[in-house]
Every structure is written in C-alpha cells, then in structure tokens.
Amino acid sequence: MSAGEPGFETFIRSAQKPFQALPFLSSGAASAIDCGDRGIAISCASHSGSTTHAREAFKLLWQSDLDVGLLQCPVPPGSESALQYNCSGKHAAFLATSRKMSWPLETYLQADHPLQQEVNRRIAELLGLPPDELVASR
C-alpha cells in the first residue's frame, strides 16, 4: 500500500541528522569520549548557535583531541566561530568518528570519504534501498 507519490525524490536535510549520527554511536566514538546525552543530542540537532550549544559542540571536539579549525561548516554572519553554526554538533561528531576510525579528518565531508559512505549505507539500509539510489550519493 502506498499513498501520494512514493517515487518522488526529496531532500530531508536536517531531519537526517539523527541518521547521520549513527556512525558516531556505532563506531564507539561517542562512548570513547563519554559524551553523554547532551553530546548525543548536539550531534543530532540543528541548534541556534547559543553559547550552550557551541560549548557542547566544542566539548565533542575537545574530548576527541580535535581542533575547532577542522570544522568545515561556515561561521554564521554576525558570529565569531563555526561552533555557532547550526550544524556544528553534527560536524564535531563527524570529526570525532573519523578520529576514532583513523579516517582522514580534512576530507570528512567529501562524498567518497569513508564516513560519508557509512552514513549513506546506514540510511539506505534503513530505507531498504541500494545506497546508489540515494539522491545525496549521486
């Protein structure tokens, strides 16, 4: 049974952040740094860039012995740091996972990076699709 247009391609954007955090959890990166509920929450969230949010994203990096300069998210207009970007927690978790898995840090956002391949594999598996059918993987 289906409703609507099941073949319609769509971008889920921030709704995929919890799925993008799966490698952070399953790799042992989250438990290795004992990030707690707040760390997991910021890794799955879009946030407002408040000091509290930026601090949680920084904590993920600090506990993973990573430098803020590795973040590949922009500095929001009127802000001082990429930590204030609404996706900084996701980026910090990506870096923590890459560090834990000994994957390259500088290229963590590239489609051919092992982390991005793992994220796509996990999302495709949950959707019951081959990874190459994901729009993001094209």
What are these regions (language model features)?
Residues 31-33:
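Conserved catalytic cysteine-centered active-site region
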Residues 5-13:
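Alpha-helix N-cap/helix-initiation motif
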Residues 12-29:
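Active-site SXXK
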Residues 7, 24-28, 46-48:
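Short glycine-rich, polar/acidic loop-and-turn segments at beta strand-coil junctions
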Residues 35-138:
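Active-site-adjacent helix/loop patches that line small-molecule binding or acyl-intermediate pockets
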Residues 1-3:
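A short, well-structured edge-of-sheet supersecondary motif
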